[in-house]
């Protein structure tokens, strides 16, 4: 039996947009206001403390609510394939052991894209055995948060493309 086992949470949503517009949205997550616009119920603060947004080696600090608790997170961007994939991981080596990576990826389809959010968690048998209910609640909350982020991204980008709403088109290209 392995000491730690990977649990991978994934959420995907089809969006009527282009990979470039999805990545442009992510690239424009630069401050509290832009971060809250993505998920106003849970996102509180965001700032890039090293490098440029979503460039390999850049570090971002974020505050958000997950399962009703405030989390203060610091991530390093570990991989970027423009318009296809962003991978990021906790800065802390200790946290990285249990939360090794998260990804945002985009698969282009005919006329649409699929936005995929993935979180990888490493769990030990002790946690899975003795804290099963708490673990299930925590993972369920993370999955819900991921789903809401995808739904919000879809709403924002599809409304942006409609002729009656260009509120997100701030000229930041």
Where are these predicted regions, by residue range?
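Short, surface-exposed coil-to-beta transition loops
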Residues: 8-10, 70-75, 97-102
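Extended beta-strand/beta-hairpin segments
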Residues: 8, 164-167
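Hydrophobic ligand-binding cavity/cleft-lining segments
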Residues: 1-50, 173
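Glycine-rich portal/gate segments that line the openings of hydrophobic small-molecule binding cavities
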Residues: 45-95, 114, 148-164, 171
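Generic structural detector for well-ordered beta-strands
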Residues: 12-16, 76, 105
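Beta-strand/loop substructures that line and gate deep hydrophobic ligand-binding cavities in soluble
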Residues: 89-144, 164
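Short strand-connecting beta-turns/loops that link adjacent beta-strands
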Residues: 18, 82-83, 109-112
């Amino acid at each position: 039996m392995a000491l730690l086992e990977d649990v991978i949470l994934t959420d995907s949503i089809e969006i009527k947009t282009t990979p470039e517009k999805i990545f442009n949205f992510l690239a424009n997550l630069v401050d509290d206001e832009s971060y809250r616009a993505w998920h106003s119920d849970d996102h509180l603060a965001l700032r890039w403390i090293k490098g440029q947004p979503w460039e390999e080696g850049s570090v971002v600090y974020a505050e958000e609510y997950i399962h009703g608790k405030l989390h203060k997170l610091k991530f390093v961007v570990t991989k970027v394939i423009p318009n296809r994939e962003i991978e990021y991981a906790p800065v802390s080596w200790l946290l990285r052991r249990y939360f090794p990576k998260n990804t945002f990826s985009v698969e282009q389809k005919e006329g649409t894209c699929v936005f995929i959010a993935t979180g990888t968690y490493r769990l030990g048998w002790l946690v899975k055995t003795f804290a099963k209910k708490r673990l299930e609640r925590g993972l369920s909350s993370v999955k819900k948060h991921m789903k809401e982020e995808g739904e919000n991204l879809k709403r924002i980008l599809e409304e942006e493309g409609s002729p009656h709403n260009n509120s997100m088109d701030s000229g930041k290209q």
